[in-house]
């Protein structure tokens, strides 16, 4: 049993390293990773868009990656619910269990959160073997593949976003952004019985994937007046809008488009300043909600896939071998217009 991993040592540079097999504590399981999804935040880290992450990479080397699934090969002495040979999905965020947020069940807002592949630990999933607390891994049934298991993490974001929004059966929605998170919001809306979902993006390949997954209509914002087009399609201003692109222009458009008493849910991470004009919504009694990761959702996500309610495989259009990690990240960063969702296969 040998462990190898890829360590980020600077902007756009991975270094392959031989690593020790992680220690398995009494409440941990040792997982042989089989698939890892390449998240948009991973690409930002790779590109040097996060100053603190780049500084840590250059100083000590860091390991990113948080969307993963694999097979348990060893268990700690206190572990009873997971056994060797079980395939599992890994919930990336671990709350402290002690702060006020954790005590309310809002552990995604924990004041001392440990998130896989993120500061302060930077111990991510880009390695063949990973030790992890057993309380935060979930057994996959036979009809959920390990590939799908790795995508439980982003699906959980979409499910959490729709839960927070309050959208439900018979409603209609607009989603800005058809990347992985936008598509999981789409899938979550459809699973809740939302009647009409319009998806907006600038990349045709992503829009076509949204159409395959069940979007009522797709709009290329570079080719049309989105506001007029949406109102024409839905027959009215939308009550629910999800901003899943992390794009300031899209966020501003949400304010202009939303209907009276509507709900705007901000799912994407806005990394750049946005000139939101609140005058656009001041007379509409609009509710703006924000989403940070997810909580208490993994079992629901796994069941939705197992029962055929949600299809995750369609969004994956690029699979790279783990040994191609450097190339995989370079291509995922450069080919955003073509790559909808990329994964590493170990």
Regions found by a protein language model. Name each.
Residues 22-36, 51-100, 141-143:
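Glycine-rich beta-strand-centered segment in the early N-terminal region that forms part
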Residues 4, 172, 195-196, 263, ...:
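Residues at the starts of beta-strands that form the adenosine-phosphate
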Residues 3, 248, 252-256, 295, ...:
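C-terminal hydrophobic helical "lid"/dimerization subdomain
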Residues 144-223, 228:
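Mid-domain Rossmann-like dinucleotide-binding core that forms the NAD(H)/NADP(H) cofactor-binding site
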Residues 203, 270, 294:
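Residues in the short beta-alpha loop(s) of Rossmann-like NAD(P)-binding domains
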Residues 55, 66, 96-176:
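NAD(P)H dinucleotide-binding glycine-rich loop of Rossmann-like/cofactor-binding domains
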Residues 165, 208, 213-287:
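Glycine-rich cofactor phosphate-binding loops and adjacent beta1-alpha1 units
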């Amino acid at each position: 049993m040998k462990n190898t991993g890829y360590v980020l040592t600077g902007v756009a540079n991975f270094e392959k390293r031989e690593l020790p097999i992680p220690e398995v504590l009494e409440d941990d399981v040792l997982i042989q990773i089989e698939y890892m999804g390449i998240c948009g935040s991973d690409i930002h880290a790779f590109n040097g868009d996060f100053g603190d992450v780049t500084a840590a990479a250059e100083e000590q080397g860091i390991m990113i990656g948080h969307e993963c699934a694999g097979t348990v090969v060893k268990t700690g002495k206190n572990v009873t619910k997971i056994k060797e040979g079980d395939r599992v999905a890994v919930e990336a965020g671990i709350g402290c269990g002690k702060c006020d947020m954790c005590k309310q069940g809002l552990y995604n807002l924990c004041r001392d959160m440990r998130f896989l592949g993120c500061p302060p630990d930077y111990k991510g999933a880009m390695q063949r073997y990973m030790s992890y607390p057993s309380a935060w891994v979930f057994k996959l049934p036979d009809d959920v593949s390990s590939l799908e298991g790795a995508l439980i993490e982003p699906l959980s974001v979409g499910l959490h976003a729709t839960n927070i929004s309050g959208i439900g059966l018979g409603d209609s929605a607009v989603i800005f952004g058809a990347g992985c998170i936008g598509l999981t919001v789409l899938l979550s809306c459809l699973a809740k019985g939302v009647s009409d979902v319009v998806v907006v993006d600038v990349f045709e390949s992503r829009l076509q994937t949204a159409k395959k997954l069940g979007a009522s209509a797709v709009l290329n914002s570079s080719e049309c007046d989105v506001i007029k087009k949406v109102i024409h399609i839905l027959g009215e201003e939308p009550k629910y809008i999800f901003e899943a692109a992390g794009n300031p222009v899209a966020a501003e458009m949400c304010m202009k488009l939303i209907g009276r008493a509507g709900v705007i849910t901000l799912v994407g991470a806005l990394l750049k300043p946005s000139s939101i004009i609140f005058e656009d919504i001041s007379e509409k009694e609009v509710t703006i909600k924000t989403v940070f990761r997810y909580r208490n959702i993994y079992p629901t996500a796994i069941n939705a896939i197992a029962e055929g309610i949600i299809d995750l495989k369609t969004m994956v259009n690029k699979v790279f071998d783990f040994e191609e990690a450097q190339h995989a990240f370079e291509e995922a960063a450069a080919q955003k217009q073509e790559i909808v969702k990329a994964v590493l296969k170990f």
